[in-house]
Amino acid sequence: MSEITAAMVKELREKTGAGMMDCKKALAETSGDMEAAIDWLRAKGIAKADKKSGRTAAEGLVGVSSEGTKAVVVEVNSETDFVARNDAFQDLVRGIAKVAVSTNGTVEAVAAATYPASGKSVSDTIKDAIATIGENMNLRRSIALSVEDGVVATYIHNAVSDGLGKLGVLVALKSTGDKEALNAIGRQVAMHIAATAPLAIRPEEVDAAVAERERNVFIEQSRASGKPDNIIEKMVEGRMRKFFEEVALLSQSFVINPDLTVAAAIKEAEKAVGAPIEVAGMARLLLGEGVEKEETDFAAEVAAAVKG
């Protein structure tokens, strides 16, 4: 069994909010496997969920850019927030986002594309900026969405400048209807995605491994009730239905009007658009996602911003 260190216990406490002794026991029961320890605590009802996905550390900016029926969201990291507030760095990120629209959107394609202002590749332009600004930086992520007919709406939460911030969202809507009205509902849905971070557009599209992990946690929690297996099975199925509803975009309660699901809100918007609307894709980039940093309640922030 792996040695359980104080650092491991501290990390588990930060991720779950569980007590020190509970964290130590969870790590001991799972041979020091951090992810398994999180699930062990959840199964015992000691921790609700792994908090790490919303915790970030990398500085820099997320930028969005669109052209016609295509849009991109990119993340460029820097070492400090001071540099992220620098005009030269902001111009660089904005320029990279504009270049990215003309590519297939992958990091490799964007890095190799020509940056107009320098005549060099984006990758070499970043290297030059490192020498000029004096701080390491890199193009970390890039995602592009497009539709043949419709719009790709964009949204930056708490923008620090036009098209730049720490959380960026794209949502692709297919429709032959009025593009202005379509973009209006698209922006609202993008704001909703910023607030709720759905795992998939539809329940059936939720990653199978994620669903299986939740199911296993629910099974262990239900067994603690001491009820018969047939009752436990029904309990688990009910909780899984609720889980899918909560993490799939279209079945979520709409942040802007909680009386409607997102699907119902889009259906309602079809009246103004004048044609059916299909959600064809979505992307959400939170700066530094996956690295530890103080957590921010984006759901509360976005909801407050929407309600004015």
Swiss-Prot record:
One of its GO terms (molecular function) is translation elongation factor activity. The keyword Protein biosynthesis applies. Disulfide bonds: none annotated. Its main location: cytoplasm. GO terms for cellular component: cytoplasm. It is found in: Cytoplasm. Residues 80-83 are annotated as: Involved in Mg(2+) ion dislocation from EF-Tu. PROSITE patterns: EF_TS_1 (PS01126), EF_TS_2 (PS01127). Keywords: Cytoplasm, Elongation factor, Protein biosynthesis. It comes from the Bacteria. Gene3D superfamilies: 1.10.286.20, DNA helicase RuvA subunit, C-terminal domain, Elongation factor Ts, dimerisation domain. The keyword Amino-acid biosynthesis does not apply. HAMAP family: EF_Ts. Belongs to the EF-Ts family. Associates with the EF-Tu.GDP complex and induces the exchange of GDP to GTP. It remains bound to the aminoacyl-tRNA.EF-Tu.GTP complex up to the GTP hydrolysis stage on the ribosome. NCBIfam families: tsf. This is Elongation factor Ts. The lineage of its organism: Bacteria, Pseudomonadati, Pseudomonadota, Alphaproteobacteria, Hyphomicrobiales. The gene is tsf.
